[in-house]
């Protein structure tokens, strides 16, 4: 049985994720108390369900500390289990709740919205380390739908490598597993004729490929990922997010993400995301 657990912060896109999973053929259960997870899986397995998506949220309470053991038990019973954790920056979540005029499930007359968001982060702290984390702060609903489809669509027996470019001035992605800083390299932004372009364009690529430092750093990052990827696979990781950052997230980091993705494309399942270009 294939099982996808969807969790995360309220307002981060859990309902969108479960809707996508339902569209691609998963039987979906929403807001399930964690204590009911194993009994439900056993029942659905007996009934012949092959693909199940279950959404769990902070209203399950203190029982989240039990999730690592529950996940281990399900895998020991033969379940192909993946956990997706959706999150976003507090300012993004506050803006979304303000726009929709919905009330946060943990807020009250004595608990403000930012306090409720922080309380939810703390409540779900045991879930995030088990999961593939997706930072939806800068993702549109349509982009998140495509993202979820990509994550559940490939062959589940192989790890999926995600190479993500970003700009440090906008913050490090919350969902990054490995972070590499390429700000030490020559910056095409200061070459007037290259400034309007991105790391996908030939002129920027040629500029960086003419730099011995850029080529040496690219080789080092590729070698690091190649050397340690087997360790992540042995740890039963379904996804590995490799984030590469420069100052603005448009030139150097984009080139590195594109080039690394191309290098691994033939051997692994690869996705590319350019946060500041989306």
Curated annotation (Swiss-Prot):
One of its GO terms (molecular function) is ATP binding. Belongs to the RapZ-like family. It comes from Thiobacillus denitrificans (strain ATCC 25259 / T1). PANTHER family: RNASE ADAPTER PROTEIN RAPZ (PTHR30448:SF0). Displays ATPase and GTPase activities. ATP binds at residues 8-15. This is Nucleotide-binding protein Tbd_0529. GTP binds at residues 57-60. Keywords: ATP-binding, GTP-binding, Nucleotide-binding. Pfam families: PapZ_C, RapZ-like_N. It comes from the Bacteria.
């Amino acid at each position: 049985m294939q099982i996808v657990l969807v969790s995360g912060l309220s307002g981060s896109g859990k309902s969108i994720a479960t809707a996508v999973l339902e569209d691609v053929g998963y039987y979906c259960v929403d807001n399930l108390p964690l204590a009911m997870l194993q009994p439900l899986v056993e029942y659905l397995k007996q009934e012949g369900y092959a693909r199940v998506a279950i959404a769990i949220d902070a209203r399950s309470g203190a029982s989240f500390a039990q999730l690592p053991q529950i996940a281990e038990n399900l895998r020991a019973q033969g379940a192909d289990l993946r956990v997706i954790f959706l999150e976003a920056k507090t300012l993004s979540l506050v803006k979304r709740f303000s726009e929709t005029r919905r009330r946060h499930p943990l807020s009250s007359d004595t608990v403000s919205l930012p306090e409720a968001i922080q309380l939810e982060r703390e409540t779900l702290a045991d879930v995030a380390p088990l999961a593939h984390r997706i930072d939806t702060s800068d993702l549109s609903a349509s982009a998140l739908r495509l993202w979820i489809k990509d994550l559940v669509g490939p062959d589940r027996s192989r790890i999926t490598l995600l190479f993500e470019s970003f700009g440090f001035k906008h913050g490090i992605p919350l969902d990054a597993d490995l972070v590499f800083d390429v700000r030490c390299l020559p910056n095409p932004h200061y070459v007037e004729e290259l400034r309007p372009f991105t790391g996908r364009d030939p002129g920027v690529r040629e500029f960086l490929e003419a730099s011995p430092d850029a080529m040496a750093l690219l080789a080092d990052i590729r070698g690091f990922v190649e050397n340690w990827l087997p360790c992540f696979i042995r740890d039963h990781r379904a996804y590995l997010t490799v984030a590469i950052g420069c100052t603005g997230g448009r030139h150097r980091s984009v080139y590195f993400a594109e080039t690394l993705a191309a290098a691994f494309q033939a051997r692994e399942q690869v996705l590319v995301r350019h946060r500041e270009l989306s």
